[in-house]
Swiss-Prot record:
It is found in: Membrane. The keyword Transmembrane applies. The keyword Oxidoreductase does not apply. Residues 1-414 form the KAP NTPase domain. This is NTPase KAP family P-loop domain-containing protein 1. It is a multi-pass membrane protein.
């Protein structure tokens, strides 16, 4: 935006004779002169100007998340940002002596009009002050010469009155400017918010609206003075971390600021639309207005913009930047200088103690150097263009930093585990891949680990070289029946197809590697596995089957006895026996069919079915 604004201004200045005025440095006295004695006029020339200057102000909602008046924080941040950019003195002078820009209906091209009332009033005050001072001087001079008379007393009275009135007028103006100079709009609004009785009244919003209108008029004055259009861009971040009612308050404040069609404000909401829509729908004071949060956003947002999918180079650059931000973990141990012991004082005991301490430190230094090398290798795999691991990292900077911050801890724990006897453990590349797996698919990974743990407890654990993907695939249908109970946890997972490609092809972790890495995992919530274990244990409990009726079994027994008495020779008997066994097998399958049918949703075919 700044580049576009600079290009527009350069193109505009090639066709006009005027140049923009400065509002800082030596331009401040001229700005104060215009503020006091001249009134701006909105002309056609000003409306045709194409050069724009953007003023960016960032508002982080989480900084004001603890207050009930989050929208008041938005307004105070806006006022404070403009005051800090243009200075407190010009805004204070405009608050006391400034005048709202006017619109002329005639064809006059002059952008400034002399404020005759201000000039005449100031001249009158100065004349009265000079007259009063002169009268006091004459009265005091005559009294000093010894010519005391009633006329001298009269001159003293008139001179004192003129001096007092004119001086008090000037002092009041200076006092008002000084008051606005030290008491900013932010302090005013915060003082109004602290009044609970006043905050619940209609006059509270009226006072805030007046402050915003004053701010808008000041920006319009600066537009005409600088000879360029001004746009204040307010970046609202962290709104998805606030309560729904406070989110609604911020949106109402934005609508209030944008209610004026000529308001020079641009609001950029950096937020997930789904979270914002859910906040609007769950807010109690928006019932009937925002029952559908997306429709409410369509009525409010004038330019929806979704960030496109991050490209390969952009993702690698972000990952590289995230890794470079953790240089303290990479090179802190590598740049350590070996400590050389000094003079031991000649005592053998102290010398042996110092040498033992130095040997211990050298051994610890070698361990730290090896850990730093492994961390560097693991993080390099994360943003290596020739590796496929970066494809599984989400296009979210927060998730990238979470993964980068977790890798050093995991690698150090893995190194400590290998030093204790597990020398053939996973590599640094497998460690960082495991961190990505736990970050992207915590529910599916927890389910595979829970199924593996249950099989170990029942004595049917798979071999160590068996793939973790096979364990998950064999129990995926059971996970499908628990989607309702685990819906919130399943929402944490990423793309299921990427999960299959991750475990099935690119990173085929074995059961032994998974068990080794599980002891070093710090970014996986173990409560998910405990919850899955409880749900699985409850679903395994089956009600006892009802007892068989003896009256039903008697006819079947008699029928079997009659069939046996009428049995043909051996060859035919064997054939009927096989047929009877097949019939019993079908009956047995018929009993199991309702249990198997419960694993599928309506409309889903059974395994092996058509």
């Amino acid at each position: 935006m700044q580049q576009e604004a600079a290009q527009r201004e350069s193109e505009e200045l090639q066709h006009v004779q005027w140049r923009p005025r400065a509002v800082s440095g030596w331009g401040v006295p001229q700005l104060l002169w215009y503020l006091v004695f001249l009134q701006p006029i909105i002309t056609e020339v000003h409306l045709r100007r194409r050069n724009v200057q953007f003023l960016f102000i960032r508002f982080s909602a989480w900084q004001y998340a603890g207050t009930d008046k989050l929208w008041a924080g938005l307004v105070t941040t806006l006022c404070e940002g403009i005051r800090r950019h243009y200075g407190a003195l010009p805004f204070s002078v405009y608050s006391v002596l400034g005048n709202k820009p006017a619109t002329r209906q005639d064809c006059c091209q002059s952008e400034w009009h002399c404020r005759r009332r201000v000039c005449l009033g100031l001249l009158a005050l100065l004349a009265a002050l000079g007259l009063g001072v002169g009268l006091l001087y004459l009265s005091l001079g005559g009294h000093a010469l010894g010519h005391g008379s009633p006329s001298g007393s009269l001159l003293k009275v008139f001179g004192g009155a003129a001096t007092t009135l004119s001086g008090s007028g000037l002092l009041m103006a200076v006092y008002s400017v000084g008051k606005h100079l030290f008491v900013s709009q932010r302090k005013k609004i915060e003082r109004l918010v602290s009044r609970e009785k006043f905050g619940s009244q209609l006059g509270f919003m009226c006072e805030v609206k007046k402050e915003v209108e004053l701010l808008t008029d000041f920006l319009c004055f600066l537009e005409i003075y600088q000879r360029r259009r001004l746009r204040v861009v307010l970046e609202v971040t962290g709104l998805d971390t606030c309560y729904p009612e406070r989110v609604v308050g911020v949106l109402n404040a934005i609508n209030t600021l944008l209610s004026d069609s000529h308001a020079p404000f641009i609001f950029i909401l950096v937020v997930d639309p789904s979270i914002l829509a859910a906040c609007l729908e769950s807010a109690g004071n928006m019932k009937g207005t925002a029952d559908n949060g997306y429709l409410f956003l369509n009525r409010t947002v004038t330019l929806p913009f979704s960030v496109p999918i991050m490209g390969r180079r952009t993702k690698l650059q972000f990952l590289h930047d995230a890794v470079q931000s953790r240089d303290d973990l990479l090179y802190r141990e590598m740049t350590r200088k070996p400590w050389l012991p000094g003079d031991a004082g000649g005592e053998s005991a102290q010398l042996l103690a110092v040498q033992a301490q130095a040997g211990t430190e050298r051994g610890q230094g070698r361990i730290d150097d090896e850990a730093a090398r492994r961390i560097q290798e693991a993080l390099f795999c994360l943003h290596d263009e020739r590796d496929c691991l970066y494809e599984y990292v989400p296009d979210n900077v927060v998730s990238m930093r979470r993964i980068v911050n977790t890798v050093p801890i995991t690698v150090r724990l893995l190194q400590q585990q290998q030093q204790q006897g597990d020398f053939g453990g996973p590599t640094p590349r497998q460690a960082v891949a495991w961190v990505v797996l736990a970050n992207q698919w915590p529910c599916r990974l927890s389910w595979a680990l829970q199924c593996l743990e249950d099989r170990q407890q029942t004595g049917g654990a798979p071999e160590g070289r068996a793939r973790l993907w096979d364990v998950f695939r064999d129990n995926s249908r059971e996970l499908h029946t628990m989607t309702k109970a685990l819906q919130n946890v399943l929402d944490l997972d990423g793309d299921p197809e990427l999960f299959e490609r991750f475990l099935g092809a690119d990173f085929p972790f074995t059961v032994a590697e998974a068990q080794s890495l599980l002891r070093c995992t710090v970014n996986l919530d173990h409560s998910i596995r405990r919850r899955m274990g409880l749900i699985r244990a409850v679903s395994a409990l089956k009600p006892p089957s009802p007892p068989k009726s003896p009256t039903r079994d008697t006819p079947h027994a008699a029928h079997r006895a009659n069939s046996a008495s009428r049995a043909p020779p051996s060859g035919r008997a064997s054939g009927q026996a096989g047929e009877g066994h097949h019939t019993g097998d079908l009956a047995h399958r018929g009993k199991l069919w309702p249990v198997a049918c419960a694993l599928f949703r309506p409309g889903q075919s059974s395994p092996g079915g058509p």
